[in-house]
Amino acid sequence: MEPIRVIESRTVVLPRENVDTDQIIPARFLKVTDKKGLGKALFSDWRYAADGSPRPDFVLNRPEAQGCSILVAGDNFGCGSSREHAPWALVDAGVRAVISTRIADIFRNNALKNGLVPVVLDPASHAKLLAAPGASVRVDVEAQTVTLPDGSTAKFPIDGFARYCLLNGVDELGFLLAQDADIAAFEGGRR
């Protein structure tokens, strides 16, 4: 995992509320264990017609959405069943942060473990982002702030250990393995 300190990007806005993990990536795509390529299945039932052709009216298929790495979502994003494939698909599609007023706990934890920054903002700040699709936004993981299109900043909470892992580009196992010498010294002192 690469360290994530700051994400600067234009936003893509998906204002739908209660987007569950089955809408993020339908169950038929969960048979794989490789993260690569899952971005093509992201929001598949919304992005593609029955014949597989892209729906031009879906926000991620529009030319202005290309290259955007910050998704501004409606309230209660990532609800539903626990599937790690949901953040995998978002990251594989180039999304680095999801901003909402509420992000489901299980999705948030899976996102953090996979290098996707879940940002929960107050409703007023979130409304500014919903009203400005394509705006340039800055997510600062270190400062725990989002710089909004009008230049103001909004704070967001993030678990301290998860923040450490994002800033240092390690997952939980990588963190534990990096402590090997200290663990061995501690265990050696107990004998």
From Swiss-Prot:
One Pfam family named in its UniProt record: Aconitase_C
E.C. designation(s): 4.2.1.33
CDD domains for this protein: IPMI_Swivel
GO molecular function: 3-isopropylmalate dehydratase activity
Keywords carried by this UniProt record: Amino-acid biosynthesis, Branched-chain amino acid biosynthesis, Leucine biosynthesis, Lyase
GO CC annotations, alphabetized: 3-isopropylmalate dehydratase complex
Pathway recorded for this protein: Amino-acid biosynthesis; L-leucine biosynthesis; L-leucine from 3-methyl-2-oxobutanoate: step 2/4
GO BP field: L-leucine biosynthetic process
InterPro entries (UniProt xref): 3-IsopropMal_deHydase_ssu (IPR004431), Aconitase/3IPM_dehydase_swvl (IPR015928), AconitaseA/IPMdHydase_ssu_swvl (IPR000573), IPMI_Swivel (IPR033940), LeuD (IPR050075)
Top-level division of the source organism's lineage: Bacteria
Enzyme class of the recorded protein, top EC level: lyase
Family matches, as NCBIfam families: leuD, PRK01641.1
Purpose of the protein: Catalyzes the isomerization between 2-isopropylmalate and 3-isopropylmalate, via the formation of 2-isopropylmaleate.
Homology family: Belongs to the LeuD family. LeuD type 1 subfamily.
Subunit description: Heterodimer of LeuC and LeuD.
PANTHER family for this protein: 3-ISOPROPYLMALATE DEHYDRATASE SMALL SUBUNIT (PTHR43345:SF5), 3-ISOPROPYLMALATE DEHYDRATASE SMALL SUBUNIT 2-RELATED-RELATED (PTHR43345)
Name under which the protein is recorded: 3-isopropylmalate dehydratase small subunit
Protein source organism: Anaeromyxobacter dehalogenans (strain 2CP-C)
Lineage of origin: Bacteria, Pseudomonadati, Myxococcota, Myxococcia, Myxococcales
